[in-house]
Amino acid sequence: MQAEGRGTGGSTGDADGPGGPGIPDGPGGNAGGPGEAGATGGRGPRGAGAARASGPRGGAPRGPHGGAASAQDGRCPCGARRPDSRLLELHITMPFSSPMEAELVRRILSRDAAPLPRPGAVLKDFTVSGNLLFMSVRDQDREGAGRMRVVGWGLGSASPEGQKARDLRTPKHKVSEQRPGTPGPPPPEGAQGDGCRGVAFNVMFSAPHI
């Protein structure tokens, strides 16, 4: 009888813990699936109920406006994300011989950038300052930590001479630039593109355990 009383007390305390009525936005808060009902109704351990709420049967936690919630602010600008997915971001600075060449590359790369965030799309942003091109790439690691996804870009460079492939390495990312010497897309109006050559960037995202 004494052990039974302790079990009942644990269930009652559970309702006031994380995910109970005391925290409206917790895993067992507002409106939810069967997992949330199990957590607040005392039919099973709180941990198992919370796992069901975010699992395949309970669905992803919902934000205040009905969208998939993220750990930071309850919103995900890129659409629904799996609980085990992470958003990977990569910044690249590429110097060119002149501001016109950097602007030429920015215009060509911007054609491939999605105007609005879409689920599963790679988000790319390009900015020019002088002869420097700043590239920002964001992708969602849907396969879990440690997996890689390759993103390819095709662009034209105003440089008349081809260059050997080179690697830019950081502790987490590897970026390869290749100039195969094939003709690239036509340059924008006003640019000197007589020696335009094809350039391809391969960005490999890796998410090692930290």
From Swiss-Prot:
Query: Cross-referenced Pfam families, in alphabetical order?
Result: Pcc1
Record's family?
A: Belongs to the CTAG/PCC1 family.
Q: Name one GO biological process term.
A: tRNA threonylcarbamoyladenosine metabolic process
Q: Where is the composition biased (Gly residues)?
A: 1-47, 56-66
Q: Which gene encodes it?
A: CTAG2
Name the InterPro entries on file. Answer: CTAG/Pcc1 (IPR015419)
Tell me a GO cellular component. Answer: centrosome
| Chain segments carrying region Disordered | 1-80, 154-197
Q: Which Gene3D superfamilies match?
A: Alpha-D-phosphohexomutase, C-terminal domain (3.30.310.50)
User: Taxonomic lineage of this organism?
Assistant: Eukaryota, Metazoa, Chordata, Craniata, Vertebrata
Q: In which tissues is it expressed?
A: Testis and very low level in placenta and in some uterus samples. Observed in 25-50% of tumor samples of melanomas, non-small-cell lung carcinomas, bladder, prostate and head and neck cancers.
Start-end of Basic and acidic residues biased regions = 163-177
- Please state what the protein is called: Cancer/testis antigen 2
